[in-house]
Amino acid sequence: MAERTARLLLLTVTVGLAWGSQGDREPVYRDCVLRCEERNCSGDALKHFRSLQPIYMSLAGWTCRDDCKYECMWITVGLYLQEGHRVPQFHGKWPFSRFLFIQEPASAVASLLNGLASLVMLCRYRASVPASSPMYHTCMAFAWVSLNAWFWSTVFHTRDTDLTEKMDYFCASAVILHSIYLCCVRTVGLQHPSVARAFGATLLLMLLLHTSYLSLVRFDYSYNMMANVAIGLVNLAWWLAWCLRNHRRLPHTRKCVAVVLLLQGLSLLELLDFPPLFWVLDAHAIWHISTIPVHVLFFRFLEDDSLYLLKESEAKFKLD
């Protein structure tokens, strides 16, 4: 549904980390980066660096300065551990061991698997649900929006840049808003299509204004987090209220209830925020992995509900 919603509800207090963390504020780290850049990132030294850099690293956008930050991060971590201190974060993130050009291997793979699950369920939905089902096109659009979000999540965890960060955040917001629209169509729009169209246009305008402000005015992490928390609460509450009201008449709504409750429960994994195991697997990656079956379950609900609506519409047509 909106896998990131539950996580957003728990991360509000950590927004400040995006602006700086203990590790990157350390004089040892700053001095190390400065010396590394002076030594390696200009003139003949830079040419030498580029000649030795693997092609996949340069294609992924890894620069000499990025490599300096990466190497100095591990030097700083080593000093912390040597002195018996807790592993620090850098730029709002734990230190991760890079694999090839992938910055956060476990989260990137987990995002990719979520995307593949979305693709498989999209194909399954299209194969099992006729296009004449009242919710077919809305559900298909939601599947594509979800697939796009997981693509950018994979890219972001592969290579964290300003662009990939924004696309990850914006596409996550789009998924939540489209889930709200999906719920609106299911609960109101089938009886009042004009209401759903007007509501959908409003949500689209909200997304446009949200992304425009963050892109053109100021990327405010706190505002972005609070905005997503607000729409996430609306999304979860609306789906849960509708499911509980209709669970006796529509047994398949239990799958949707399970999705909402599981997402809330699994989001507690984020509270376990700990340095990555083997410098690869952190709580966020585990959370991403755990959402794969939940994602599949929600698409199963959409499939069951669409087939129910098709059967209901065909029965009404025969009566008419």
From Swiss-Prot:
<feature type="glycosylation site" description="N-linked (GlcNAc...) asparagine">
    <location>
        <position position="40"/>
    </location>
</feature>
<keyword id="KW-0812">Transmembrane</keyword>
<feature type="topological domain" description="Lumenal">
    <location>
        <begin position="21"/>
        <end position="98"/>
    </location>
</feature>
<keyword id="KW-0337">GPI-anchor biosynthesis</keyword>
<feature type="transmembrane region" description="Helical">
    <location>
        <begin position="99"/>
        <end position="119"/>
    </location>
</feature>
<dbReference type="Pfam" id="PF04080">
    <property type="entry name" value="Per1"/>
</dbReference>
<feature type="topological domain" description="Cytoplasmic">
    <location>
        <begin position="191"/>
        <end position="198"/>
    </location>
</feature>
<keyword id="KW-0732">Signal</keyword>
<feature type="signal peptide">
    <location>
        <begin position="1"/>
        <end position="20"/>
    </location>
</feature>
<feature type="transmembrane region" description="Helical">
    <location>
        <begin position="170"/>
        <end position="190"/>
    </location>
</feature>
<dbReference type="InterPro" id="IPR007217">
    <property type="entry name" value="Per1-like"/>
</dbReference>
<keyword id="KW-0325">Glycoprotein</keyword>
<dbReference type="GO" id="GO:0016788">
    <property type="term" value="F:hydrolase activity, acting on ester bonds"/>
</dbReference>
<keyword id="KW-0472">Membrane</keyword>
<feature type="topological domain" description="Lumenal">
    <location>
        <begin position="157"/>
        <end position="169"/>
    </location>
</feature>
<feature type="topological domain" description="Cytoplasmic">
    <location>
        <begin position="120"/>
        <end position="135"/>
    </location>
</feature>
<feature type="transmembrane region" description="Helical">
    <location>
        <begin position="283"/>
        <end position="303"/>
    </location>
</feature>
<feature type="transmembrane region" description="Helical">
    <location>
        <begin position="199"/>
        <end position="219"/>
    </location>
</feature>
<dbReference type="GO" id="GO:0006506">
    <property type="term" value="P:GPI anchor biosynthetic process"/>
</dbReference>
<dbReference type="GO" id="GO:0006505">
    <property type="term" value="P:GPI anchor metabolic process"/>
</dbReference>
<comment type="similarity">
    <text>Belongs to the PGAP3 family.</text>
</comment>
<protein>
    <recommendedName>
        <fullName>GPI-specific phospholipase A2-like PGAP3</fullName>
        <ecNumber>3.1.1.-</ecNumber>
    </recommendedName>
</protein>
<feature type="topological domain" description="Cytoplasmic">
    <location>
        <begin position="304"/>
        <end position="320"/>
    </location>
</feature>
<dbReference type="GO" id="GO:0000139">
    <property type="term" value="C:Golgi membrane"/>
</dbReference>
<keyword id="KW-0333">Golgi apparatus</keyword>
<feature type="transmembrane region" description="Helical">
    <location>
        <begin position="136"/>
        <end position="156"/>
    </location>
</feature>
<feature type="transmembrane region" description="Helical">
    <location>
        <begin position="224"/>
        <end position="244"/>
    </location>
</feature>
<feature type="topological domain" description="Cytoplasmic">
    <location>
        <begin position="245"/>
        <end position="258"/>
    </location>
</feature>
<comment type="function">
    <text>Involved in the fatty acid remodeling steps of GPI-anchor maturation where the unsaturated acyl chain at sn-2 of inositol phosphate is replaced by a saturated stearoyl chain. May catalyze the first step of the fatty acid remodeling, by removing the unsaturated acyl chain at sn-2 of inositol phosphate, generating a lyso-GPI intermediate. The fatty acid remodeling steps is critical for the integration of GPI-APs into lipid rafts.</text>
</comment>
<keyword id="KW-1133">Transmembrane helix</keyword>
<feature type="transmembrane region" description="Helical">
    <location>
        <begin position="259"/>
        <end position="279"/>
    </location>
</feature>
<feature type="topological domain" description="Lumenal">
    <location>
        <begin position="220"/>
        <end position="223"/>
    </location>
</feature>
<dbReference type="GO" id="GO:0005789">
    <property type="term" value="C:endoplasmic reticulum membrane"/>
</dbReference>
<feature type="topological domain" description="Lumenal">
    <location>
        <begin position="280"/>
        <end position="282"/>
    </location>
</feature>
<keyword id="KW-0378">Hydrolase</keyword>
